[in-house]
Structure formats: structure tokens, C-alpha cells
């Protein structure tokens, strides 16, 4: 079957250009004009009406909550929400129950993802059994079973010896190691950023050093082990300084930033509001400015949402007792496009690179994040001019725990194709 996308706007040579895209057998067959003259009529035609067509977004940091926490999310609902947000590939974090910490459990998750997901799912395995700081997983076995990377996300590996051995094991088999960086001895059970805002609200704070100290430890271990070390959801200026220096020294370090850390800071927390509780927390305005600067100068390699759905009950009451985490996969593009591209801090092409091309390249997801002939037809069609208000009622995730509800934004995802097939669009809304 062939599909022709007509009158698409694509980002080429630093600007938007109009073209057609021909899809055959799930892959991009041709990009250009008057393709029907060369290839004949297509079986199906999608009129893009001059809307923007992007390579599908790639999010390497998503919590699908399945198995074990399906009241929050499932593979099906989380990946449909991903398609709604324009994502065609997501990395499923391993903080589920049971933890994918053996080859058998990883293989089970890979099979379930293939059967139940609406988009491509790259499966993480944990670094250690049970996501503790003790026994390492069988790195060769979990890679053979289909893991694309390892992470203990949600928990920092607390002992340097365990982390170094893990890095050596991951490096030996060529698996990236993605780290939730948090030193428990410096954490002190805080619920938001330590500082004047936390003091005013009477809430326990989380110091910047609890993150930055573990980043500093880990980059030295990464240099010694040769692993691809990836810092999850970087949030502090100090962490960025360490990462910037590590890159300058030639250490194989990459990092991601989440949309909420680019768009919000602790000064936006004017009351005890669980919808603004996440880990790492919203930091100071100075930290937020440093993250934006890191995005602009290339220190930050990619954007990842840390999509963390919860039930309504888990996000009620006080920040002292509510669960950490917010959703983000359905709001990421629109909020970032509105705040960064419409204000000319970033070009559209650079945002697409950060949300699609670079995460795919750096994590070895070589078939994702590209709008080129021969690549899988993982594409997102977006109305860049449509302004709308983010509403909980339109979200397809089970979790509606978003601080962006009510925000006016531009950039409405109209349709998402995965391997040339409709994953989200009008037909899925019937």
C-alpha cells in the first residue's frame, strides 16, 4: 500500500519548504514534487494543507507504569498519549512491578510492547536487581533479550563501587547507562527545591548538591569505564557545569532536560500545590536560566518528558504527601514550541533535532527520528498556527497531573503515523 502526503511543510536547509512525501510499505519512498508522475497514483492521499510534517518525536524517558501500576497508566494508554503528543518512539523506564531485571522479564516486556503499544517502545532494563544499589543485572543477557539501555530511574545508585561495576558491565556490551542522579545522604526527604520559596511555604527542600554531587562522581566513573553515561532530567546549574566540563574533557556524557524544568521554576509555586511536585524539583530561576542557556549552547543533548502519570488521588492534598511526578508527553511540543520557538529563542529545526533526531542518534535508535528516503514513515503532522488551551478532557493518558492545564499554546498535533499507519488522528477519535 502507498500513501501520499501532499502539500507538506518540512524543515529543510534551515527553513520551511513545501513538498510531497510518498510512503510505501511503511517507509518513506520519495520526497519531492509531482511524485505521481514518477510513481503513479497512490492508494491513499493525505492532504497536509501546508501543515508542518516532522519526523516523529523520540522520548527516551517515559513511565508507562505497566505492569504493576496500571491504575496510573498502561502500555496502551501511555503510547496512545505519546502518539497524541507527536511521539513515535518512547523509552519505557523500568520502575514497574516486576522490575525488568532479568533476560526473561525484559523479553516479556519487549513482546508485550510489540503487541500492545501504539508507537515504538524501546525497553529499559534496570541497572541492578530490584533497582537497589546492590546486585548487578546480567548485562549481556538483558541486551540479548532486547533492552536498549539500562537505568534505575527513580533511584540513584548510591554506592560508587556498584555504579563503577555497572558502568563497566554496560560498556562491555555497548549499552548506554541512564542515571537518575540523587545522593540519598543529601536528599533529606524534601518535596521541592530548597530555598526561600520552600522556607516561605514551610515545605522541606531538596538541595542542588544532592544532584550535582552524584553527577560529579559519575562522570569520573564514566571516564574510567568508557561507558556512554546519560544524565536523566538535569535540573541544576551545578550539574550542567560538571557535564560541560566533562564533555570538554572528551568523556562520553550526554544529558536530557525535561520541558517543565525549562518552562517553570520554584517561584511558580505560590502555594502548596501537588501538581508542581516532581523529582528533581522545579529549581530556582537561576537554574532555569542555566538550563535554557545549556540548551542553546549544546551542553544539553535532548529533551525528554519524564512522563509520570498518577491517579487523581495520589496528586491531591499536600506536597508533603502527594506523589512525585507530572505528565508531559501530550504537552511537550506545544509548550516548548510556544515558549521557545515562537519567541525566537530556538529555531523550529533545532527543537525538532532536540526532540527527535538527537535522542535517536545518541541512543542508537537508528531507524527513528529521521525524515529521509528509506527511513520508517514515523511522521507527525502539526498545525503550527492553531492556538488552543491545554485541557485535561482532551488528554489520552490516564494521568491528568499536569501543571500546564489551562496554558494557551500553539502547535496542535493533527495526525501521527507509525510505520506509515495511523497511530493518532481523526480516525482514532471516532
Curated annotation (Swiss-Prot):
Keyword Zinc present in the record's keywords: the answer is yes
> Does the entry annotate any disulfide bonds, and if so which pairs?
none
Q: Which amino acids does the record list as binding substrate?
A: 63-65, 95, 279, 310, 324-325
Broadest EC class? hydrolase
What CDD domains does the entry give? DHOase_IIa
* Cofactor needs: Zn(2+)
BP-aspect Gene Ontology terms: 'de novo' UMP biosynthetic process; purine nucleobase catabolic process
Sorted alphabetically, which InterPro entries does this protein's record hold? Amidohydro-rel, DHOase, DHOase/Allantoinase_Hydrolase, Dihydroorotase_CS, Metal-dep_hydrolase_composite, Metal_Hydrolase
Q: Which GO molecular function terms does the record list? A: allantoinase activity; dihydroorotase activity; zinc ion binding
Positions of Zn(2+) 1 binding: 61, 63, 153, 306
Q: Name one Pfam family in it.
A: Amidohydro_1
The pathway that the record names for this protein is: Pyrimidine metabolism; UMP biosynthesis via de novo pathway; (S)-dihydroorotate from bicarbonate: step 3/3
Q: Reaction catalysed by this chain?
A: (S)-dihydroorotate + H2O = N-carbamoyl-L-aspartate + H(+)
Which top-rank group of organisms is this from?
A: Bacteria
What does the function comment of this entry state?
Catalyzes the reversible cyclization of carbamoyl aspartate to dihydroorotate.
Tell me the HAMAP family matching this sequence. PyrC_classI_B (MF_00220_B)
Q: Which family does it belong to?
A: Belongs to the metallo-dependent hydrolases superfamily. DHOase family. Class I DHOase subfamily.
What name does this protein carry? Dihydroorotase
Instruction: Name the lineage.
Output: Bacteria, Bacillati, Bacillota, Bacilli, Lactobacillales
User: Gene name, please?
Assistant: pyrC
